[in-house]
Amino acid sequence: MSYNITSSNQYQYFAAMWAEPQAMLNQCVSALSQSYQTQAARDTVRQQFSNLLSAIVTPNQRFPESGYRVYINSAVLKPLYEALMKSFDTRNRIIETEEESRPSASEVANATQRVDDATVAIRSQIQLLLNELSNGHGLMNRAEFEVLLPWTTAPAT
């Protein structure tokens, strides 16, 4: 028994692109209340989102029988998730100084504005992702999955 792979683009469904819906929703809600003033804080939350993803099917392991799973690579969620991951990475762009040990007042003000901009971007992307998840976009159950990738059983002997 296995999935009937008929096209090379079907291999994407075996990648670590799946998450439990409740865990993803909870992470979004929790992340909206976080502070993003340091790169370490941004890295921590980015890692928390990344840790939610796993592979749930293989060519020989069937999609879970009950419940829904979030497919982060869906047409609706993929651009939102990618934008969220990019918004966390502000390393080396926050403080750009002439003399690193003594930033000028304008460099500090510029860095503060960049941190604020990064925080706004992160919160905005999280809210967009949360909205789409709440609307049911990117969620799949076994029946929906197996329309895309049929499960075949061995012929009776």
UniProtKB/Swiss-Prot annotation:
Keywords: Acetylation, Capsid protein, Helical capsid protein, Virion. The modification N-acetylserine is found at residue 2. It is found in: Virion. Coiled coil: none annotated. One of its GO terms (cellular component) is helical viral capsid. GO terms for molecular function: structural molecule activity. Pfam families: TMV_coat. The keyword Protein biosynthesis does not apply. Belongs to the virgaviridae capsid protein family. Capsid protein self-assembles to form rod-shaped virions about 18 nm in diameter with a central canal enclosing the viral genomic RNA. This is Capsid protein. It comes from Ribgrass mosaic virus (strain CAB). The gene is CP.
